Structure formats: structure tokens, C-alpha cells
Amino acid sequence: MARVLGVLLCLLALFSSSLCLDHANGRGDQALAQINVYETSLALDSSVKLHASPQVLGSQGEDTEWVNLAISNPKPTSDDWIGVFSPAKFDSGNCWPTSGGKEKTPYICSSPIKYMYCNSHPDYMKSGNVTLKFQIINQRADVSFALFSNGVQEPHLLGVSNPVAFFNPKAPVYPRLALGKNWDEMTVTWTSGYNIDEAVPFIEWSAKGLPARRSPAGTLTFNRNSMCGNPARGVGWRDPGFFHTSFLKELWPNREYIYRLGHDLVNGSTIWSKNYTFVSSPYPGQDSKQRVIIFGDMGKGERDGSNEYNDYQPGSLNTTDQVIKDLKDIDIVFHIGDLTYSNGYLSQWDQFTAQVQPIASTVPYMIASGNHERDWPDTGSFYAGTDSGGECGVPAETMFYFPAENRAKFWYKTDYGMFRFCVADSEHDWREGTEQYKFIENCLATVDRKTQPWLIFIAHRVLGYSTNDWYGKEGTFEEPMGRESLQKLWQKYKVDLAFYGHVHNYERTCPIYESQCVNNDKDHYSGTFKGTIHVVVGGAGSHLSPFSSLVPKWSLVRDYDFGFVKLTASDHSSLLFEYKKSSTGQVYDSFNISRDYRDVLACTHDSCEPTTSAG
């Protein structure tokens, strides 16, 4: 009976935690979710004029352009707003068939891809004659701009602009690199409007100075029926295009390669992207400088100021820009969950891949699964929340490559030089006896610490330690059943660092085991491994999460600000940790680990190999 009661209490804690996190993470703050699309009424006004220019975008191959929207409205109000629609035709003719509910078909059935209040221009309320600037990316369809009055809950459609379109709306765009399953393999995934019956996708690539060669690409997509619920199946749905992945194999270590995306059309012509470059991975254990960026919960921003609501993702562009600025000193990036915060509005995935393209096209962009990618009731996720907006993992698992055995089970291991990364999936059960637990132990157990001394554990939710406000109120300082399930593995296999997102701030613990600091140093750790350092690095972009007023001894550094972590391995014995502010790029927290192979082998707290007294 006591055991049953214990299980029930654990489950209660789990689901109460999920509810708390839904509130704390601002579920529903997705800007597009504020628009009550189905309540739109037609109120066309012939005196309202809208003109968008230029009408042809990307004539020189660009995938991003600025559009000027000239507005003339003789009766401006503070509730007027512009919706940007793509495809440009957005009336009831595009409505998804439904079996019931509404007495009549609504005039609009799909969300805009972005929106902006007209009074964001200071002169709008004075004259109603202004020009707004919108940044438009290539999303495989034409674009129109619509003026609405009466706010976003019961919008009145007053007028629609002329359409604008990219010269080639189907062009290959937004390449994103990822490590393959072997160290000498790089994968390239990109988006286009070409299905395989229209064009054959491939990568043309070469080491600098050598002849180019081609590697074929596979093609995937998904449809509305792939979504698990609304808004992803309803107003948030937008055709995602096609996703192509090519595997570049047998790469030389640490060599620069040039590549471009290609599609051979059925008419015999070829569509090309511009040229990109990357540097291949070092050989596992190679002694060279290796630099890693880690952050979570970045989301996306709009450089034109649109889609601003409730300060939802205020740090996203700063983090992106700082990483781009430092890109020559970065080798690989880990974005550990809550990628876009699209929450069922599919257009946001294109906008996210466009935002991170300068990073992801140059260095491997490795991802983890978060609640905003995966969680939906009765779909196999560990949490019964609705944070994915009905996406249930499909866009993340399809649009990005990661070297998992089963893409629906978002856990994987990957090696980069002197690093071994074990990436867990906190949205699936990780407890002892589960398939994922066995993966985690295997990942930790199979690394050769002689050649790869730096062992890193990654998960989205905080399976270790955090003094975030809601964890503090629960008294757990963690995701329920997190460290209780995994700490003996971290200790046994001597995990150097464990990283988490989900909580939108920065926090670092002492080297810790069973909630006790096992080392009193703060900025330099040397000698025998004693315990794992746990780091929350979920402050990359989404609105910040407050800390608890309780500060346990194990919490060494906290920062209520946006930032990211950089790891620099100089050799097999030296690792530099830096936490940088997204706003300035300045280092706010840092420490060094100095550890030789014998220090990893040495016996310490619950991580001793059996011995015998026999001679």
C-alpha cells in the first residue's frame, strides 16, 4: 500500500509540475494565437488603399527581402493592424473541411504568418497615411498584406494589398548542418518547394582545391493529418514544403569544405543555392582546440518588430547575433530544446530556420527535444501537456537531422573530438528500466575517457538541480524523478557537466552528488573527479523565469538574464567554461577544469571499480 501511495504521489508531483510549467513558460503567449481568425468579418472599405513593393523579391537569389507597405486609411484607429498572409489568397476557399461546429464557414481559416499594429508607426494616428516595413523570407508562396480594424478578437477586414512573390518561391533555402552517426560524416538538411517528381535534390561539395562531387539527398515532408491537434491541424497549419537531407561521408578531419544545394529539374536545368562552407569534425580524441556553444529555449524574433506580444521571446535575436559574431571561434552548437515556440503555427518553423541559417549552415546545429516540440495528450509523451500546439514532435523530427536510431525517440550520442555528448529526451520516460535509461547508461559507459576526457550530459527539462521559482515552491529543485533516477549514472561514469534548458535563466551548481557539494572551489576544479557540475542554460531568448528566494548551498551562480555557454577544450587535461551575456557577449561566469586521465580513473563517491587483494 505504501508503495502504491508513493507512486501516486510521484505522479501527482509530475502532473502538477507540468501544469506549473505550462503557466510559467507562458503557454498561449505565441503571438499568432492571440488572433481569433474564425471571428473575422468582411468590411471592405474602398477608401482604404494598400500597396506593397517591390512586387518581385529575390531577383538576385536572396531568400530574405524588405517590403514597403504603403497604407492609406482615412479613419485610423489604435486597434488597426496588418496581417501578412502567405499564400496571398486567404479567404474561405482555402478552409479545411470540418464535420461540424460552426453554422457557416468562416471567412478566414488560416493564421497570418506575422502581424503588426499600424500605430507602431508614430504618424499613423495623425493621418492614416504611412509606410510600414516588413521583412519577408522565402516560404514557397506569394504574400499579401491585409488591414484589419477592431483588434484581434473580432477583426474586421478593411482591405488587401497586391501580392508580392519571390522570383523562385521553390528555391532551396536555409541549410542546416548536423553531425552524422560516424565522426567523418556531415549531414546537410534544407527546405525547398520541389517534390521528387519535379526535381532531384543533391549536394555538390568538395574540399578546397579539389574537384567537386555530388551526394544524393532524401526527401521528406508531412501533412495536416500528421499533426495531433489544433492549432497545428487548424488555423496554424501551413504547407511546410519539402525537406532534403544529404550525407557527406569519408571527410578528412578538420578540413574546410565548400558546398551548395542543387535540384536537377525535369526539363534538364539545375537550380543552385549560393556557396556555403564548413569545417569537418576532428578525429575522436584528437588533441586540438575545440569550441562548443550550448543554450536552450531561444525561440525566434522578428527584425521588423512584428509579432510582439507579452514580451514572449525578447532575447532571441541578441543570442543569435552574438553567436554569429563569434562564429569564427565556434565549432559546434547545441540548442537543447524549445527551438521555435511555434506552438502549432507552422509558418514559424521557416522563420526560425531562416534566423539561424548563418549559424546552422556553417557549423553543426545539434538539437534536443523540448516540451514545446513534443508534448500533446495521448501521443506517447511523458507529460500530458499541450505545449506543442498539436505538433507532437513532427516538425522538429522532420526538419532537422540528428543521429538517433529512431527519430521519434529523441535521444542520441555524438562525438566531437575530445567530447562525448549524451543527449537525452526529457519528454519521454527516463527512469530506471526504460529504453531511454538503457541508452543513457550505454552512452556514458562506452566512451574511452583516455581519448575523450570530456563527458557531457544534455536534457531539456532540469533532471538535475535548479532553484527556479516553481521548483522551489515544490521543494524539489528539479523535475520530479529526475536526479533520483539518474544521479547514480552521472556519478558512476563521472559526467563532467550536465546541461538543461526549460528554465529561462542561468544557474550553476558546485560539483554535487546527492544534493551535497563535494568540492568547495568555485572557479577552478582539479584532480580527482568528485561530482557532476549541473548548469541551467535556458535563457537564450524566451521570457525570463524568476528564481526562488531559497538559495541552497549548492547554487553557486545565478543570473536572471539572457545568455549562453561556451566550452573550450584546449587539450585532454584543460576545459574552460564561460557563460556569456547575449546582450553584450561579455563573460559573466567562468571556471576551469584541470584533470588528467588518472584523475578520471581514481575511486571516489560511489564510482569505484571493484578490487581484489589477490597478488
Curated annotation (Swiss-Prot):
The keyword Iron appears for this protein: yes
Quaternary context: Homodimer.
Pfam family of the protein (one): fn3_PAP
CDD domains, A to Z: MPP_PAPs
Gene: PAP24
Protein name stated in the entry: Probable inactive purple acid phosphatase 24
Database matches in PANTHER family: INACTIVE PURPLE ACID PHOSPHATASE 24-RELATED, PURPLE ACID PHOSPHATASE-RELATED
Residues modified by glycosylation: N129, N267, N275, N318, N592
Transmembrane parts of this sequence: none
Organism: Arabidopsis thaliana
Molecular function GO labels: acid phosphatase activity; metal ion binding
Source organism phylogeny: Eukaryota, Viridiplantae, Streptophyta, Embryophyta, Tracheophyta
Cellular compartments per GO CC: extracellular region
